[in-house]
Structures are given as structure tokens and as C-alpha cells.
């Protein structure tokens, strides 16, 4: 009896450790990316950040599937995210394209780290208070911003982009990503699986096509996927801002015949 209880206890502790192992793997990849950046192995650093992105997406799902979510795991995940998606991309961007700007370059890298920390703090506060939404993120998620930095390095090396074009592009990108992370721009979270459940066949075909495209041109595909997601927030915001104006214009520019017919319909209803 005692032996059985001890075995069950070890199993429970093992399941509890399992999601934190994925978090630790994400943290390790982020730290490795920092080391690789200082050694000038920028391609390895970018790949490490993308692998960290995968591990970060798995730890929460494993915790929910095994029923081992905890406050410790949430806090540990946030600290790991700060290293993997804050410090590591900032160091990569600085050593790869910002070091030539001097003070302006390292200030941009620091701004990226600071806004990542602020983004994570706000996310934790909203999650604990229960006011966060499952359908969207408030501000650009820091893993998506880190993926944008990493895939930019991959894309630039794929195209052979060097010189001032690369340096100024990285500088502008870091400032834009920093702003988007602490902004109130909404980004889709893709946590709602109702659409996948309603159209399983279409979803399966889409995943197969995406995998084929990724296998053919992984660097190009990952870059455009990251860039499209980063642009999704401002595009959706623009649509929401102009949609009321468009509806007002459509109601005020109706033809006189439509107005007369509408009035006649209202009379008939009375």
C-alpha cells in the first residue's frame, strides 16, 4: 500500500514537472540564442529563438491537458519568455544590425527588452483579473515579435542583404515591434477552435498546404507568416475605424427612391 502511494506521488510530481520542462527548454533555447549572437552565429541564434517559440507554445497546452496548471508555472513561463523573446531577440538584433548605430542601437535594443517586460506584466495582470479575451491579444504577443526578428535574420541571409539597408531596416523594425507590443492593438489569438471543428476537412487541407509550402521554402515562408501576423493588428484596427464611417456614408447617400419606399413600408407596418 505504501509502495503504491509512493509510486502515485512520483507520477503526480512527474506530470507537474512535465510542462515546466518545456518551459526550461524554451529558456535554454533563448539563452543559447544570446550566446550564439555574441559568437557571430546569427543563423543559429535565429533558429534557437524559433525553437523556443515552439516549446513556449507546448508548455501551456501540456499543462492544461495534464491538469497541472499552477501559479508557479505561470510565473516561470513569464520569466522564461522575457529571456527567450525579450533579451535574446534584442541581443540578436543588436549584434546583427544595430551595433553600428552606437548609442542609438543599444538604446533600441533596451527599448525592445523593456517593452517585452511591460507586455508580459500587462498580460499577467489581465489574466489574473479575468478581463482578458480568448479571441484576441491586447498588443503584439512577444513570441510573435521575437519570431519577426528571427525570421528577418533568416530572410536577409537567404537574400544576401547586407549594408545600410539591413541596418536601417532592423532599427525601424525594432522600434515598430516595441510600440506594437505595448499598444492596445488587438491581435487574433487563434485559441477558439470552433472554426476548426466546424470545418475539419478544410482545416486539414489548409494545414497540409501550409506544411508543403514550409517544406519548399522554410525561410521565406516563416518570414511572410510572421510579417503578415504583425501587420494583422494594424490592418484590423484600420478596418474597425473606417467601418462605422462607411456605414454612415451608405445610409446618408441612399437614393430618394429608396427613402420613399422605406417610408411607404413604415406606413404599411403601422
Model-derived features: positions:
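Multi-pass membrane catalytic core of lipid/isoprenoid biosynthesis enzymes
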Residues: 14-23, 65-123, 152-154
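C-terminal membrane-associated helical module and adjoining short loops/tails
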Residues: 1-7, 134-270
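Helix-coil boundary and interhelical linker segments in multi-pass alpha-helical membrane proteins
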Residues: 32-47, 83, 87-109, 151-169, ...
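Topogenic membrane-insertion module of multi-pass membrane proteins
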Residues: 1-57, 236, 270
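Hydrophobic, well-structured mid-protein blocks that either form specific transmembrane helices
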Residues: 109-148
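Active-site His/Glu-centered metal-binding helix of metallohydrolases
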Residues: 28, 54, 58, 62, ...
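Hydrophobic alpha-helical transmembrane segments of polytopic
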Residues: 22-25, 45-52, 108-111, 115, ...
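C-terminal ends of transmembrane helices
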Residues: 61-70, 117-132, 182-191
